[in-house]
């Protein structure tokens, strides 16, 4: 398999493809960038970025500009190849309205395995893992959080995302008290209606999560004001554990 063009200005990014020795342990193609201070004896926070419909492991690197230097960045590729190019986390049954439960469950199992394997092969602290998902990647993040009783996250960011309409997600979860959740959505989103974001916000608030919510006058993308808010949110959840005073480590790279 041919290696894609890695993101420019992202520093020492490593591509883990099918021939890489770490691939059998993770089962998802991914890119990773470790901070210089990362050691097995000194595991670091990590931010895992889940791309949207038709993206790949290089699609989410624009978010490096809001991620603190202290954190590793990991970008997995969704396991399903799309007919028109790129990759997807799950298929749809009716246009883009009803998720296909079988393909979603298959990807969910692989994502769970992937996340559980990361601290075994990289110097990452599993208790300081944050997820950022865009669109379908956010839908996968919500599905993971709502169905994984044992999952511990530093936080979850949902960008132009939604909770999939699946029976498995209908029952309320009771393990989300205090979970930091960031939601940003465009009021003119033509793909995922704004109401889906508001429903997501309301549900997590009922479940006890600490929700940071914002709407911006934009379409199916991330507004610059949302990026600034995301930067602050990430700093708060990842840097408070080191005192929050080390600007060199807590600023983005």
Feature-to-residue mapping (PLM):
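Alpha/beta-hydrolase fold nucleophile elbow
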Residues: 123-133
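C-terminal catalytic histidine-bearing segment of alpha/beta-hydrolase fold enzymes
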Residues: 195-201, 205-253
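Short beta-strand/loop motif that positions the catalytic acidic residue
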Residues: 182-185, 189
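Conserved alpha/beta-hydrolase "nucleophile elbow" surrounding the catalytic nucleophile
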Residues: 51-53, 132-134, 186
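Active-site signature of alpha/beta-hydrolase-fold catalytic machinery across serine-
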Residues: 62, 143-147
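Serine-hydrolase catalytic machinery in alpha/beta-hydrolase-like enzymes
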Residues: 20-124
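A conserved short beta-strand
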Residues: 151-163
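Gly/Ala-rich beta-loop-alpha elbow adjacent to hydrolase catalytic centers
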Residues: 133-137, 141
